[in-house]
């Protein structure tokens, strides 16, 4: 009985912590803010975790969901699965997703993506000096831009989103049909 009474506070703490941890998860929205006037997306060259270089200009002709994120960012982690789902759904239709990680190394990103239920298959690029995020005027993470086939930024979202929500998918389909 003495062992059980000593165990009860620990079990109570673990239960309360688990419930509160789930309760405190950031909610994800689904709205994207249209830019009043589309602007040219800044071009950049970045490497992925395997040191392969990507030139953003090579994505011209595709609708691009460009997401700035970091492993320490809870809403970034929460929105990753929805980015993968929308990528899988539309990738063959002139659409792609690019994740631009902020100031973290490839080993940390590899470990993080490996811990997710579904490992992302879209391109993840490293902005180790945060120069690309500065060019895109990123002020908080996650920040996402939806770029049309002509390379113009058309929509922006600051904070976590469910990118496979039907409202977001309508926007993506609309841009793909232009």
Question: What residue ranges belong to the model's regions?
Answer:
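N-proximal helix/coil linker or "cap" segments that precede and/or mark the start of modular domains
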Residues: 19-43
């Amino acid at each position: 009985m003495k062992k059980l009474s000593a165990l009860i506070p620990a079990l109570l703490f673990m239960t309360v912590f688990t419930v509160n941890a789930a309760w405190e998860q950031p909610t994800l929205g689904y709205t994207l803010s249209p830019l009043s006037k589309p602007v040219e997306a800044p071009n950049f060259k970045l490497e992925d975790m395997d040191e392969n270089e990507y030139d953003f200009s090579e994505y011209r002709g595709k609708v691009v969901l460009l997401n700035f994120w970091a492993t320490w960012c809870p809403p970034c982690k929460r929105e990753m699965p929805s980015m993968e789902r929308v990528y899988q759904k539309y990738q063959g239709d002139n659409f792609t997703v690019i994740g631009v990680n902020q100031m973290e190394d490839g080993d940390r990103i590899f470990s993080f993506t490996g811990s997710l239920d579904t490992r992302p298959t879209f391109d993840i690029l490293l902005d180790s000096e945060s120069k690309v995020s500065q060019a895109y005027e990123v002020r908080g993470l996650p920040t996402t831009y939806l770029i049309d086939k002509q390379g113009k930024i058309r929509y922006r979202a600051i904070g976590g989103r469910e990118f496979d929500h039907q409202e977001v998918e309508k926007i993506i389909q609309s841009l793909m049909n232009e």
